[in-house]
Amino acid sequence: VSPSHLPHRPPRVLEQSTKLQNVVYEIRGPVHAQAARLEAEGHRILKLNIGNPAPFGFEAPDVIMRDIIAALPYAQGYSESKGILSARRAIVTRYELVPGFPELDVDSVYLGNGVSELITITMQALLDNGDEVLIPAPDYPLWTAMTSLAGGTPVHYLCDESSDWQPDIADIESKITDKTKALLVINPNNPTGAVYSAEILQQLADIARKHQLLLLADEIYDKILYDDAKHISLASVAPDLLCLTFNGLSKAYRVAGYRAGWLAITGPKDHASGLLEGIDLLASSRLCPNVPAQHAIQVALGGHQSIEDLILPGGRLLEQRDVAWERLNMIPGVSCVKPKGALYAFPRLDPNVHEIHDDSKLILDLLLQEKILMVQGTGFNWPDHDHLRIVTLPWARDLAVAIERFGNFLSSYRQ
């Protein structure tokens, strides 16, 4: 039958899948879209919303780019699904230098198109409908989103602002049920900048032992530390537990666009053959991670660790952290715990001074008036409308101006 002879019917409406009902990622959400529209109209937007080092003048070490260029002729085909062997061996060597880190086999390392892809793969392989994952509040929201997408239920445990944003152990214990399957630890923490103490990490491991939970360790910022802070890998305090450690090149090596991440699996595996087969299946189904970026891993991990020049006294990242923290605390009604790591500050707006009922509206109004883009605290699954996240990547002078403008904005802002 020709199309002209078919009865006229309105086109079928294609709705969004119900699987996306609870999937939210505000870091690039509606306010970010509004910022893009303003940019298209010619406005200059200061983007304090995303931890993307390159636009702020942070360049990858030359040796990384040279190695990728040299490897391009050999990177035209697929690699092994887990990634090229030389990169995975370099990751094994990296963790051999981490005090107490459990033995890591090269076959237990998976490369990914950034940590984000490996989070997605892990949650899809791990979760059945209704399975619960303990996730910090505030969190990096992709963990919550991918838990929901996989059919799981994110259960947020509180981190205590009055204790340098360390996890609230009692709150975690109170939220464990017979459906709890995994405990996520983000350390150093995004968005708070907290670096967890050995005592807290041991208590988290004890909870996992007691309740037979899988440990998930997001440690992408483990080399971005300030003020003599020491990072302790979660796997190192729990060598007897199955632990999935996530890391990559995006932050410490300033190559977020290369999308080069990894997953390292340590601990006993006999009881987890089904999970590991699932991760294998999903890693194979995407064929392989992008191959050129895999060639950056060996040289990055084995070469000069230039991130140290940025975080020590006189380093740009340390200076910017200091400026952000100091200037935020100068604003009436604003307080900020000093970040010990990562690339963010998570200030609090005193509700007795700033009556914010809708932090999304606050962020949108700030964008429209001051052309500054931040992310509201509820975008990180913080329960109250009294926080926001600021990226500390801009030059110190730009940060100082932006925070001053933010303070001026707050002084007359009402909801």
Residue ranges, per PLM feature:
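PLP-dependent enzyme catalytic core of the Aspartate aminotransferase-like
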Residues: 2-3, 174, 355-357, 361, ...
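N-terminal small-domain helix-loop-helix segment of the aminotransferase-like
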Residues: 5-114, 121, 288, 300-303, ...
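Generic structural signal for small/hydrophobic residues in well-ordered secondary structure
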Residues: 31, 48, 68, 91, ...
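Helix C-cap/helix->beta junction micro-motif
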Residues: 41, 150, 210-211, 241, ...
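Conserved core of the PLP fold type I
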Residues: 75-206, 223-236, 404-405
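Hydrophobic residues in well-ordered beta-strands that form the structural core
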Residues: 135, 156, 215-217, 374-376
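Conserved core segment of the aminotransferase class I/II
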Residues: 236-315, 325-327, 410
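Conserved glycine-rich beta-strand-loop-beta hairpin in the small C-terminal domain of fold type I
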Residues: 298, 314-325, 336-350, 384
